[in-house]
Amino acid sequence: MNYQLIGNGELSSQIGIILPTYREEENISKLIEAIENLKIDASILVIDDSSPDGTAKIVKEKQSKYNNIRLMIRPKKSGLGTAITDGFRFFLSLKQMPKYVMTMDADYSHNPKDIPRLLSTMYENDCAIVIGSRYVKGGKIEGWPFTRKIISRTANSIAKFSLGLKPRDCTSGFRCYSTKFLTEAISNLHSHTYEIQIETIRQASLRNFNMKETPVLFVNRKSGKSKLTSTEIRSYLTYTLKAISRS
């Protein structure tokens, strides 16, 4: 996909963090600051789908303060799945490729303070994917309406039982990936929206890669509007059905 990449200089961090954004001017500044305050060896890639608010402007301001931030501006809203795969390709193309790539929501539903926990699980278990899980012991969701909880539980049940996937939380977007796995799987990632979460787990499962879950607290966004639409729910169900037919 065509995009404009803003930011100069070589990146050489051990960790790449992908932050897909659309209309996140109320959240992106404090999220970037929270990540920077962790003092980990990480580079941040914000992928913005030409938000009509001030998201990109805020990121550019942060770039004047931190040299480890890159901004990818895509011409239009193109889906979470393509944003994440564009982010994967960006980090895999670096001269000094990071060892791990993380994904998380830019609306502060995922707490940056949980990043070290995901990384520790990755270091200890040498996984393809570590999932920040809402559904293992210690994991929790705050602020979701009952209908959203039902949708999430149903989506996870469909993925687990129809595709034979082992993780309890197959739809969490808070993750750490090894670039060893991403290098093998990237050509098989074709999702456009939220089904990317299922597709990556399925690709790891098909290749017999190890996956682990670590508990996190998911807090429903307090600022801005939810990005999950009925179209994206249909895309998720369509992908799952296609995957079943290929099994």
What are these regions (language model features)?
Residues M1-I15, R117-S120, G164, N188-S247:
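Hydrophobic helical membrane-anchoring modules
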Residues E26-K30, D53-K62:
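Acidic helix N-cap motif at the loop->helix transition within catalytic regions
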Residues D48-K57, Y108:
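A conserved acidic beta->alpha catalytic loop
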